[in-house]
Amino acid sequence: MELKKLMEHISIIPDYRQTWKVEHKLSDILLLTICAVISGAEGWEDIEDFGETHLDFLKQYGDFENGIPVHDTIARVVSCISPAKFHECFINWMRDCHSSDDKDVIAIDGKTLRHSYDKSRRRGAIHVISAFSTMHSLVIGQIKTDEKSNEITAIPELLNMLDIKGKIITTDAMGCQKDIAEKIQKQGGDYLFAVKGTQGRLNKAFEEKFPLKELNNPEHDSYAISEKSHGREEIRLHIVCDVPDELIDFTFEWKGLKKLCVAVSFRSIIAEQKKEPEMTVRYYISSADLTAEKFATAIRNHWHVENKLHWRLDVVMNEDDCKIRRGNAAELFSGIRHIAINILTNDKVFKAGLRRKMRKAAMDRNYLASVLAGSGLS
């Protein structure tokens, strides 16, 4: 995952500025922005300040003939970049440097950039859908929608950009759509979808197939996990079965459907053992030939997108507090954060959390150079 490869892909992004007015190359501005975000920059002024402090370092990788651009120039140039071209470069870069694994679970989930709305221009907050490799903890693709409700139409567009052959694609209930299932199958992947309560017939079929008696004493393949933490105990039971004859009609509606899956969780407070545990039941459908244990692993991996991506973006990078709104800048800056997370996550030299890695990159040029060079990366 070397910076050189990334910059080769970024070099194809068109620069729409008038040539005679250009003082700072587009590639230099993007290089500066990426390095600054890796080092903890959260806005345009942070990026300018980083550049002024690290100009001699940056000249090892770019030209910077006219020094560091001011923050207004950085903001103006980045906001005019084509998001489609940027996402294309990002995905091609990840394909080039990230080895594919047929056992991978790709979690697709969306996140709203809360402060990206622009009241004065009547523009709502943007919603970014990410494809996350749970095996490698890397973002492998992203696409923007204007609202969460548009995920249904955006997910197929994102899938078009990805190589999902042999992978299991997981989504939340919003992505549980027949058209999406068919598209995943056509691209050689398998799906594992959470079933929506609004899907009446399918939801009812699950309720009839898995009554409370079956959940307490499963007759089908099952796998249980018990965990204790912070004074609480949770038992998670996973049940998987083939599609029974009485529900065979669903295999014509959902392409490739093979398994009905149920996840049951029993939560209790250890100090209050006399109380009945809180019970939650979730239904899933899958085209993959899953065992109960593999099903448990897959749905647990799906939540890595929350813990290893969204949490990092919000808590470590303060994405929700970012008020960058100009032009395409909010969407582009989201993608640059993904680049920074990928580069830092893949660094195996300094074994620390993302926040410490960012601080070290800001303070230690040798470490930043090591990260950019792909030193110690898989």
Swiss-Prot record:
One of its GO terms (molecular function) is DNA binding. One of its GO terms (biological process) is DNA transposition. InterPro entries: ISAs1_transpos (IPR047647), Transposase_11 (IPR002559), Transposase_11-like (IPR051698), YbfD_N (IPR032806). Transmembrane segments: none annotated. Pfam families: DDE_Tnp_1, DDE_Tnp_1_assoc. Belongs to the transposase 11 family. This is H repeat-associated putative transposase YhhI. It comes from Escherichia coli (strain K12). The lineage of its organism: Bacteria, Pseudomonadati, Pseudomonadota, Gammaproteobacteria, Enterobacterales.
